[in-house]
From Swiss-Prot:
Its main location: membrane. Part of the ABC transporter complex UgpBAEC involved in sn-glycerol-3-phosphate (G3P) import. Probably responsible for the translocation of the substrate across the membrane. This is sn-glycerol-3-phosphate transport system permease protein UgpA. CDD domains: TM_PBP2.
Length: 295
């Protein structure tokens, strides 16, 4: 006879317990999302005092704007680089710490420190290092015959914001990867080694499948981070330049809505960005998750 499941003495208590979370979701997500959807089909004056229904006109104008399409492409490239490089570097560092016995605590502490730095501060730190006139890295590159000026070179500007964004997120990824690696039974790794599997083969055939749930979770988190949370890095490092080379969708929304006071266009861009992130998340859960092995 199976034991009975513990229940609540009052039928309304479960609903009361989830009410705060539902209220937060409604106030900070559903309400703003609903307003953005409504404003996206309106044309508003700069102060939002008068409006006129225009249907899909705002969306049509966006997809006819070459600068918006360029920011769309920039966002995809930027997000892929931040998520891909961040996950690979973090996994490599976690694997190194996991196999190092001496000084592993020191390595963990040093690798966790960047997570305590605000994104804007992280961008400023890298700006000082890559400053065309005073930066230490810039002077080192100059001695090698390479000229650096991210304010004029779009490729260098993209490299700078990707580097700062990846550096800021490495600590978060590192903690999860290290915990996942340390949870793998050593007996499995030792058995694979006895069977003749080398370090590389053990990693790809044994370790990587076992940590795939964590890898999948971090893939989703890093893509969302690249889409939204890198705004302070871009704003502080390049301001979206040069020539909008580092203007992502989230930064263009800010520029249109807060700097240009084009509320209708920024609302339409917000809706498109929301649908894009939802679509990418659905694709990941439908196709990528199939290769994830849950224990």
């Amino acid at each position: 006879m199976s034991p009975s499941r513990p229940g609540f003495s009052c039928s309304w208590l479960p609903y009361l317990l989830v009410l705060p979370q539902l209220a937060i979701t409604a106030i900070f997500f559903l309400w703003p999302a609903g307003e953005a959807l409504w404003y996206s089909v309106q044309t508003l004056d700069p102060f939002g005092l008068s409006s006129e229904f225009v249907g899909l006109s705002n969306f049509i104008q966006l997809f006819q704007d070459e600068y918006y399409l360029a920011s769309f492409y920039t966002t995809l490239i930027f997000s892929a680089l931040v998520a891909g490089i961040g996950l690979i570097v973090s996994l490599f560092l976690a694997a190194m710490v996991n196999y190092v016995l001496r000084g592993s605590r020191l390595y963990q502490t040093l690798l966790i420190l960047p997570y305590a730095v605000a994104p804007a501060v992280a961008a400023v730190l890298w700006i000082f290092l890559f400053d065309p006139g005073l930066g230490l890295i810039t002077h080192a590159l100059a001695k090698l015959g390479y000229s650096w000026n991210h304010a004029q070179n779009s490729g260098q500007a993209m490299f700078l914001v990707v580097l700062a964004s990846v550096w800021k997120q490495i600590s978060y990824n590192f903690l999860f990867f290290l915990a996942a690696l340390q949870s793998i039974p050593k007996s499995l790794v030792e058995a694979a080694a006895i069977d003749g599997a080398g370090p590389v083969r053990r990693f790809f055939n044994l370790v990587l499948p076992l940590i795939s749930p964590v890898s999948f979770f971090l893939l989703v988190v890093n893509l969302v981070y690249a889409f939204f949370d890198t705004f302070p890095v871009i704003d502080a490092a390049t301001g979206g330049g040069p020539v909008q080379a580092t203007t992502t969708l989230i930064y263009k929304i800010y520029r249109e809505g807060f700097a240009g006071l084009d509320l209708s266009s920024s609302a339409a861009q917000s809706v498109i960005l929301m649908l894009l992130v939802i679509g990418l998340t659905v694709i990941q859960f439908r196709f990528v998750e199939r290769k994830v092995r849950y224990q």
